[in-house]
């Protein structure tokens, strides 16, 4: 196969340049397809209302819901992180993906029905209705925005930068800024519907490219049996450092783990202990899949509850594939390129990938640039760009929703739809600017622990949120005081672990971290279990010692009362009163509310084009504002969780089938 290589003077300095017509044509065709879908959604969907922009008008059927859930979850961090951890330690990291098969069913069957009957757009808004007060909603909004910027965006930016460096040799800043610009354009212009349609397209691009590369990789290594025959012998030949403080490196630092072929590992000595993987990971996954804005927003856009459940099942089936499309190819990359992917000498690793702690993160990009022929190499670049753009676009849109609905409306409670839409789009621009400013930090933090980084940060900050959401949905006795102080207490515990670990660093086998054992010895997933239990006990204890919330405020806000027909007195009703309506306080009201008419001269042609581009043209609807009866009918439709019994049985049987498949695979690779 033809390769375009610039030979460097040292190991790791080779640059494969995608400068041939076949690769360029594939990349151009992909971008034209994505832009075309985004423009189509601009014409097709209603972006002139808050509900239309943020919830896709509640019109999505099951297959784009499921594809969007999967595409929003699978970013370039998964390609780089899962393959890298697979190269470093074997199959166990796939447990992060297969655990989601069960948790995503909890989302569709237990959590989403309550979110729908509550009539909310954002998760902090649900807690506002459930508990009253402002401090929980504000706390969760700020925490979510913090996690978006410093974990999700940073991971995607880092992993995208790794791939671009390996595949293109372009300037990192120019490449990533261009990607962010394109992502921002179709996020700002298209709203959630554009994201969900482009997510669907990109899901197929991601899977097609990953399947092709997996086929090449298995062919190169000698098939499935060749992988398991050769992986334990995949060791670097360079094991002596010129640094006197390092010298001869212990074989335990460069030999593959003896338990590399097992998902469930020793509870004490394992790098992913099985109790932590089964329990601690479920807690962190529960936060991500059941209360994270990026994921839940996709479900809330579903046509009805049956379509949402079917979408969750489709997402679950898709989550079976990363083991075979990412983890195993990462292991194959170590077999094929042990001196690069499995490097252990600090100065060698520095030359190969720019960091001294290890280069396992280049496992997947290395396969692409070494194995793929012209055209297909361009396809894989398009796959990685699709993953990066999909994940970033999801974060931009969802963080825009959070900021607009949960923070800005506290500052401007009487803001109309037009102002809220404008602020939401400006927030996307601000997030892009922060992302670009964060690039030097991400580049300086290139280490061998990408997937551990995101999971550990989540384990230190997410369990209190998981505990509060679980208790909020299933324990009516929990009140605002208990929930708030449970969150605060959990945050303090998490920071007590997070700050020392990042101050001392995670270290490596060659140069272990100096972090005191009292703070850093406990595995981060074990710590997640401890943090979840402590936060839950604190929340329950304070709730039981203080006054309960009367049941009249809880109808359709807790799981046991999701079918209640009683009229609910919302604890946030004070925000709905006043001379001017607040369009963001009811999940259905804003979905039917058109932008307020402004008596002003007709805008010129240029301004009309700009307003249409941003989804703010008043001529798009072609109909008068809805009547009070129409608003009420729309609200009832959005909060309806009734299902056709026949289709409900179909999705229930499919859920059982998916769980059976998942249990078999867990047992087979245990």
From Swiss-Prot:
Subcellular location: Apical cell membrane
Glycosylation site positions: 248
Species: Mus musculus
Ligand binding (Na(+)): 71, 74, 387, 390-391
Gene3D superfamilies to which the protein is assigned, alphabetical: Sodium/glucose cotransporter (1.20.1730.10)
Job of this protein: Electrogenic Na(+)-coupled sugar symporter that actively transports D-glucose at the plasma membrane, with a Na(+) to sugar coupling ratio of 1:1. Transporter activity is driven by a transmembrane Na(+) electrochemical gradient set by the Na(+)/K(+) pump. Unlike SLC5A1/SGLT1, requires the auxiliary protein PDZK1IP1/MAP17 for full transporter activity. Has a primary role in D-glucose reabsorption from glomerular filtrate across the brush border of the early proximal tubules of the kidney.
Deleted gene: phenotype: Mutant mice develop glucosuria associated with increased food and fluid intake.
Name assigned to this protein: Sodium/glucose cotransporter 2
Superkingdom assignment: Eukaryota
Cytoplasmic face residues: 43-61, 113-134, 294-307, 405-422, 476-480, 546-649
Keyword terms, alphabetized: Cell membrane, Disulfide bond, Glycoprotein, Ion transport, Membrane, Metal-binding, Sodium, Sodium transport, Sugar transport, Symport, Transmembrane, Transmembrane helix, Transport
Pfam families, A to Z: SSF
NCBIfam families per the UniProt record, alphabetical: sss
GO biological process: D-glucose import across plasma membrane; renal D-glucose absorption; sodium ion import across plasma membrane
Gene Ontology terms, MF aspect: alpha-glucoside transmembrane transporter activity; D-glucose:sodium symporter activity; metal ion binding
The keyword Iron-sulfur is annotated on this UniProt entry: no
Tissue occurrence: Expressed in epithelial cells of early proximal tubules (at protein level).
Family, similarity comment: Belongs to the sodium:solute symporter (SSF) (TC 2.A.21) family.
Topology within the bilayer: Multi-pass membrane protein
Stretches of the chain found on the membrane's Extracellular side: 1-20, 84-91, 165-171, 216-273, 330-373, 445-449, 504-521, 669-670
Subunit and partners: Forms a heterodimer (via TM13) with PDZK1IP1 (via N-terminal transmembrane helix); this interaction enhances SLC5A2 transporter activity.
Transmembrane segments: 21-42, 62-83, 92-112, 135-164, 172-193, 194-215, 274-293, 308-329, 374-404, 423-444, 450-475, 481-503, 522-545, 650-668
InterPro entries in the cross-refs: Na/Glc_symporter_sf (IPR038377), Na/solute_symporter (IPR001734), Na/solute_symporter_CS (IPR018212)
Disulfide linkage: 253-509, 343-349, 353-359, 515-520
